[in-house]
């Protein structure tokens, strides 16, 4: 008989931490903690295979599942001494999701399941605390109705708020047993009104309703969005964990909390977290109440007057500190823990590798290696390359004036400025218009995830460091300030009030997620300083990677940034980007308007010294590192004005005839410029353009070599080659110019001539082309366009639908399509190296900074990747991980 249920508890478990794919992260963690003898409430896991079966069979379950669940539930009752549905000593359970990848808050949870009108009386009698029993029952009705019955929780919040207002109460803890009992009746009536049916009283019906709801939540919109943002496959499914309830809401000797074994924002090695006395777990993570600090040191640092867990519950605190040491040593990583204290007894509800900022990830990885818990190679694999992006963006200038409006909790580091928006939909809409926004909410919920993704930063008035906003923002690398209680939001009026000032949607704010400050208006930012653990981990990564990492740089500023980030050369210098300066664009336009070759050469002569200076600066900055310069690539019409007014203005500035300029612009118009008169085709028809650029390169190389005494070996790249004959023709012009400059300067010139492989024909004919080309650089942007027959500039209108419908697993312009484009690259490398065995091969499209694409480049045997300057550290780390066999496989 197939096994559909895995039990844990009482010092043993049927699963292990290695069974994460089957049991999900939560189930595997609970099983492992139980096996380690840690205090875990007994329970069982329904594995991800059941979720897969559920969706493949019209929301039906395997035939044996109900019998196995009943048996496992009976075993939980045996261990606890309780019975499910019993009216004397009832067993209550929680039902939680648990995917193999952490998806905080994205799926559904139900607590206190098993309560009904009879068992609530039994719970009251057994506990001797009627208030606790009815508080638990009203929580269950709220969660079950929201998750299973589709009755939104705001209905119950309104009933509660009205009752508190009428009774003169401020806090939930002010309510008495009689209050909760009355509210339970009102809640049940609301369910009857909304659904037309009474609230379910049969515990087994409740259980299967909750199990079905958790499986269904795998396909809710917020979970789908989260999976898309974090590249989590839909096919993985979720497990369901059913576990005996332990209660943190049994008075002042009970509590619930979340802790990390190291600080998830900074990586500092000390217990970090929050707890709430007389509460249940959802109160902490939902951010509805602002929690208390766990340690005395943290309480003093925060300036809180509320007691810490260390002071209020010293025995439970001591046990927690012991357990966190056990778990970190066992898992050899920072752990995120959930716990409940029931009448001074600590229970562990979850352990998992904790989400952390890039800054924390670097520090934790390096310190774990230095402590001997992991190797340096393991440390290199512990940091997500894409997360380094968090470290490479502006922070607030220390010299900037800070007009502090309020201070909350520093929930996710970094700083951001933007216009205030009060809803996730507004944030997404304004982002689409190119505007930067700060999402301001009382608290965020999983429904806000699309707006959080669109926002530059997040600001909440409630919630702590482990609230939904904090956890999700850290995972996204977004600055976040939470729990800024001095702020007052009026959603209906669209205003934010603080210290007597009223701000409207569209006003500018700055949030500093490193200090918790909310600042007035726009504030100056500075670039980050990278050192310490960053430098250490990067040096370890450089020690294991095989691929070189170059940069795409067109200006001295780009080149300097790239060198600072560890670039080993320039893999793509786009010479056309040097032509758009006001002085230069006029000379380019004169060249385009010229009636004959002589006039064109006269215009190009004006550009020669400018290009020579550009190249000389790059050669000097790169200090002997390779520099690959692409000859002019875009079609000429891109340099001409558009529209009558612009044409008249440009003609006046040039002293040219507006009609001639307009006629020339019309004459250069193309129906499909991506496949038109561009690239090497310009050099074939107008060889004088390539000659001018080659002369500028060689004169600059000779000048820098003479002044510095260091060899300069430029790599000249001819774009959009489809045939060897094209390359032969252009290379002959380049070689002739090299000989001329060599004769004029009397010095030696060493250079390489290669080509971009960006057309399928070029990849297929790579063996022949390599007879002339001394290196290949795969231009994966255009190769993707020409392989798919998709214009990158026009793809946004439909590519989203393709990824949503799983026609393409990822956007092929973001992550390389291995099966199609990747196969052409493999063919090109193999055939090229058959002709020229030491052929140097790289890529220089946007994919050069994508970790999954870099993993492919490692597998395909390329020599280097080239990416934008700010992605160089990402590429260095991704290349190291690829060499260690941990690259991200991604397919389209």
Residue ranges, per PLM feature:
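Short beta->alpha connector loops at strand-helix junctions that form conserved
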Residues: 44, 461-463, 482-485, 573, ...
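Nucleotide/phosphate-binding sheet-loop regions of phosphoryl- and nucleotidyl-transfer enzymes
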Residues: 1-403, 410, 429, 435-438, ...
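Conserved alpha/beta-domain cores
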Residues: 96-97, 530-532, 540-892
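Glycine-rich phosphate/ribose-binding loops and adjacent secondary-structure elements
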Residues: 345-347, 445-453, 457, 467-471, ...
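A glycine-rich helix N-cap at a beta->alpha junction
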Residues: 508-514, 740-741
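Short, compositionally biased
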Residues: 372, 519-537
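Intrinsically disordered, low-complexity regulatory segments
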Residues: 423, 486-487, 534-538, 554-556
């Amino acid at each position: 008989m197939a096994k559909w249920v895995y039990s844990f508890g009482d010092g043993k478990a049927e699963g292990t931490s290695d069974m994460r794919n089957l049991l999900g992260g939560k189930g595997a963690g609970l099983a492992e903690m139980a096996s380690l003898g840690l205090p875990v409430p007994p329970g069982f896991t329904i594995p991800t295979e059941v979720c897969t079966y559920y969706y493949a069979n019209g929301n039906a379950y395997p035939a044996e599942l109900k019998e196995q669940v009943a048996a496992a539930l009976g075993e939980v009752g045996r261990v606890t001494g309780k019975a499910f549905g019993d009216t004397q000593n009832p067993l209550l359970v929680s039902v939680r999701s648990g995917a193999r990848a952490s998806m905080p808050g994205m799926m559904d949870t139900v607590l206190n399941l098993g309560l009904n009108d009879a068992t609530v009386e039994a719970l009251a009698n057994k506990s001797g605390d009627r208030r606790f029993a009815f508080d638990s029952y009203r929580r269950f009705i709220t969660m079950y109705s929201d998750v299973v019955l589709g009755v939104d929780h705001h209905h119950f919040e309104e009933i509660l708020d009205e009752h508190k207002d009428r009774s003169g109460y401020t806090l939930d803890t002010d309510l008495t047993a009689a209050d909760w009992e009355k509210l339970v009746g009102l809640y049940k009536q609301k369910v009857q009104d909304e659904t037309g049916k009474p609230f379910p009283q049969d515990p087994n019906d409740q259980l299967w309703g909750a199990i079905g709801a958790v499986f269904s939540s795998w396909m809710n919109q917020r979970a789908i969005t989260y999976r898309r943002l974090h590249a989590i496959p839909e096919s993985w499914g979720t497990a369901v964990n059913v576990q005996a309830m332990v209660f943190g809401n049994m008075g002042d000797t009970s509590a619930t909390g979340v802790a990390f074994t190291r600080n998830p924002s900074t990586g500092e090695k000390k217990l970090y977290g929050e707890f709430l006395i007389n509460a249940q777990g959802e109160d902490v993570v939902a951010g509805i109440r602002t929690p208390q600090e766990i340690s005395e040191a943290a309480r003093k640092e925060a300036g809180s007057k509320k007691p810490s867990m260390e002071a209020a519950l010293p025995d439970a605190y001591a046990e927690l500190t012991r357990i966190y040491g056990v778990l970190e040593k066992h898992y050899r990583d920072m752990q995120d823990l959930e716990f409940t204290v029931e009448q001074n007894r600590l229970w562990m509800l979850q352990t998992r590798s904790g989400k952390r900022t890039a800054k924390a990830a670097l520090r934790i990885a390096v310190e774990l290696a230095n402590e001997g818990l992991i190797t340096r190679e393991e440390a290199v694999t512990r940091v997500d390359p894409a997360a380094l992006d968090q470290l490479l963006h502006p922070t607030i200038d220390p010299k900037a004036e800070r007009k502090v409006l309020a201070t909350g909790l520093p929930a996710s580091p970094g700083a951001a400025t933007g216009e205030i928006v009060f809803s996730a939909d507004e944030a997404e809409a304004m982002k689409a218009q190119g505007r930067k926004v700060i999402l301001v909410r009382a608290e965020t919920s999983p429904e806000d995830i699309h707006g959080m993704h669109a926002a530059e930063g997040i600001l909440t008035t409630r919630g702590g460091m482990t609230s939904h906003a904090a956890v999700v923002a850290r995972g996204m690398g977004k600055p976040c300030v939470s729990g800024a209680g001095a702020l007052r939001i009026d959603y209906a009026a669209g205003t934010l009030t603080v210290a007597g000032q009223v701000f409207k949607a569209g006003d500018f704010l700055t949030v500093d997620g490193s200090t918790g400050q909310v600042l007035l208006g726009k504030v100056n930012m500075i670039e980050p300083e990278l050192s310490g653990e960053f430098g250490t981990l990067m040096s370890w990564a450089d020690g294991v990677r095989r691929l070189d990492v170059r940069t795409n740089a067109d200006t001295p500023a780009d080149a300097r940034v790239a060198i600072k980030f560890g670039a080993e050369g320039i893999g793509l210098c786009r010479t056309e980007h040097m032509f758009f300066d006001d002085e230069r664009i006029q000379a380019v336009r004169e060249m385009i308007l010229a009636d004959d070759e002589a006039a064109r050469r006269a215009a190009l002569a004006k550009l020669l010294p400018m290009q020579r200076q550009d190249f000389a600066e790059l050669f000097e900055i790169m200090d002997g590192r390779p520099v690959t310069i692409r000859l002019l690539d875009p079609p000429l019409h891109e340099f001409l004005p558009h529209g009558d007014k612009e044409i008249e203005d440009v003609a006046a500035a040039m002293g040219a005839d507006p009609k001639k300029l307009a006629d020339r612009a019309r004459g250069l118009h193309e129906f499909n410029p991506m496949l038109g008169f561009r690239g090497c085709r310009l050099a074939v028809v107008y060889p004088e353009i390539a000659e001018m650029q080659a002369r500028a390169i060689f004169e600059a190389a000779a000048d820098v070599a003479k002044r510095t005494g260091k060899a300069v070996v430029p790599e000249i790249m001819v774009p959009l080659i489809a045939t060897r004959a094209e390359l032969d023709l252009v290379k002959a012009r380049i070689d002739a110019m090299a000989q001329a400059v060599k004769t004029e300067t009397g010095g030696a010139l060493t250079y390489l001539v290669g080509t971009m492989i960006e057309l399928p024909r070029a990849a297929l004919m790579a063996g022949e082309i390599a007879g002339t080309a001394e290196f290949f650089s795969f231009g994966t942007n255009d190769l993707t366009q020409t392989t798919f027959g998709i214009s990158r500039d026009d793809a946004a209108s439909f590519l989203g639908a393709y990824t949503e419908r799983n026609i393409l697993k990822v956007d092929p312009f973001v992550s390389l399509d291995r099966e199609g484009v990747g196969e052409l690259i493999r063919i090109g490398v193999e055939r090229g190296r058959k002709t020229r065995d030491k052929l140097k091969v790289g890529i220089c499209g946007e994919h050069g900074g994508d970790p999954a694409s870099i993993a492919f480049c490692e597998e395909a045997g390329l020599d280097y990747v080239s990416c934008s300057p700010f992605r160089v550290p990402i590429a260095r780390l991704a290349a190291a991980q690829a060499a260690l066999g941990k690259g991200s496989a991604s397919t389209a």
